[in-house]
């Protein structure tokens, strides 16, 4: 396994993301986006800082932040400055003790009877897991990061409002109209699953056909939501929706 960390600093919006017991914090803004890109840009391990973050802690700018990891000396300086009362060795030791005292046990996979909208994901355990063929679909709001950057200082309330409206609409289309299952929100992207068939068999053609219809419904609902937000003067600008899906074992 390779651990790669990306860090940036700047003004961000912190929002409570999700509904119905599936809440998690989400940070909006250039800093969050740049940090994520640094973390996922390449496969080499290490801690990578943008030039803004490097300057904030007194380091010099570099020509290629995505290829310049912190040195051991720079990491030690950060540790000394932070004066943390915990070490990596302590965390690993406690983790191993927890694994010993609370073993995961064996994994048991069964199939879920469609529609996936009835799947209670929080109730799943290693011994009560699901595995079957289905479509995994992503709908990503294109241009939202630029919209946040343009409005974070003067219009932060509408940024959060637009995000919640658009994602709620996408989730409603997925779960209510097409009986799919939202897996999670990833920033301004929604990830879901959809399956047609029975507990014993996935109907491949029907599943892919419904996923294609779902992609069209995503776009139609997104365009309508943007139109209504513009009429209410909550939004002005350019945003689009990028959709991709694939079929296989989940």
Per-region residue spans from a language model:
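Catalytic NTP-binding/metal-coordinating core of nucleotidyl cyclase/transferase enzymes
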Residues: 1, 123-213
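Catalytic/regulatory signature loops of cyclic-dinucleotide turnover enzymes
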Residues: 9, 30-53, 246
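Short helix/loop capping segments that flank catalytic or ligand/cofactor-binding pockets
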Residues: 15-16, 57-58, 145-148
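Catalytic core of nucleotidyl cyclases, primarily class III adenylyl/guanylyl cyclases
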Residues: 1-28, 174, 178-206, 225-250
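Charged, alpha-helix-enriched surfaces in structured cytosolic catalytic cores
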Residues: 26-33, 48, 165, 213, ...
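Intrinsically disordered, glycine/charged-rich C-terminal tails and inter-domain linkers
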Residues: 23, 43-136, 143
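A glycine-rich helix N-cap at a beta->alpha junction
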Residues: 216-219
